[in-house]
Amino acid sequence: MTKHFYERNDWLLNHETNKTFEEVQWMTEDEFRQWFIDLRKAVVHSWDTMGQPPRVGWSEDAIKKQFKEMYGFSVHEFEHVDELTGEKDVIRNTSVVGNAANQWFPTMMKTRINYTKNDDGLSIYDHFLKDELLEKTLKYSKRHFKRDSFYAYSNTIKVNEIINVGSYNVKFKNGNDFVRWFEENNIRQYGYDYWVESRDDDEEYSGYNEQLKGAKYLEVTQDILETIPTKSTMNIKSHDQKKYRLRMYKYGQKIFPVGLKAFRVSWCQYAVNFPPLTAKLLYEKFTKHVKNQDRIVVYDPSSGWGGRILGAMASRTSIPLHYVGTDPNTDHTIDGGGGTTSTKYSDLADFYNSAKNEGVLFEQSNTYEIFQLGSEVVRDDSSFQTYKGILDMVFTSPPYFAKEAYSEDPTQSYKKFTGYDAWREGFLRPTLETAVEYLRNDRYLLWNIADAKFGADMLPLEKDSKDILESLGMQFKGVVKMALAQMPGGNRIDPDTGLPKAKNFCKVNGMWLKYEPIFVFYKPEP
């Protein structure tokens, strides 16, 4: 039986280009360049011939185990109070359970991200494939793999931090003493080494982690550099600096899988999935008042990367839940057998239901129906019209106009409508009109969208969505704050206000977090 998902990428992890950190550390400039060229070729080969992008992935058994956890997962523990407002409107989901849904969609990181109106955005895949991007990616890779910018393989050493190596239990007030101890006692015999990192005199931590502010680290001065082996000083940018910081590491650490995140975090933006457990929470929370009917029908106008259909299948509602989704992306079409076609959404849902019911005496599954049409035209489909007036919830994360080029299909909304105004009237408005018309009274519509920078313009996606929905009689009830697991770059604190510089932020358990807004609307009784 054909599998429509990729599994753990053992081919890349076992490939000869998966060097250890010390091997990369000790490479000359030319050696590093050739290693990286070979790595790019290996990644493209894995992606194109085996359908495996540069992500680790889980095995089929691990996916089943993960999916089995979802139905009984206590998702309501994700809800938190925002300490800035006192409202319990923050969802902080740090679990990876359900993330295996990504493995049905290897084209996620082939999605181009547009920053201008020229539709010339690049994807992570482009950065591996295109020769003209070699120098850019080489520069980033030196930073991440040779200089370990994510601190994935080597750590700075704090002043008076206890170091346990072999039979030694020592601490140092300065880096020069550390170097003398390390070299005189041949500490490398215990499988450890260090490298010297250039630091600017005025470099100071400016992030949100209070524990890192004011921390002092072991540093060495110029006069001791000549006593340090060349292999440990290959990353020094300038020998004219007054001080250099020490980074210690253990031998034998492979660059991957840990290093795979570097491609997602730094090269360019990439498409992300909606967290399945967060979707499960929202389905359960906003349909709990639905009673006295045979099933709960939820509608997803942009099925995307499968996160919401998986969350729907895992939802634990008082009555069975039926998911209706639509998406025109033909990349998600698969052979259904017997000359028919199906979708990866169907395959994902069926796989989940099979895993959930495995070994269970009384099987119970939520159901689904998928349409491969744009949400602006799906109302013309006779089968979809059977849902008119019986939807119990509408919930999606729609396209941000042309910000993300999900595929090159002419049916994609950004291809059909080349300008924002035309897209708003030709896609956004009819999509919302259908959603409201087909929604029952006393029901909710959740809209995960945010204003997007596009060239010199800031697209008013939030206001336009709100204006259209309110013109259709929907009542705005507030915002659910979906906290992000990481805050790279955007977590900096404004020294004048003491607040994060991000547009949307909240505070949970004393920690600043960015969030994506999910706008909540209600359709009242007439």
Annotate each PLM feature.
Residues M1-K68, G72, D82-F128, E132-Y151, ...:
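Class I S-adenosyl-L-methionine-dependent methyltransferase catalytic core
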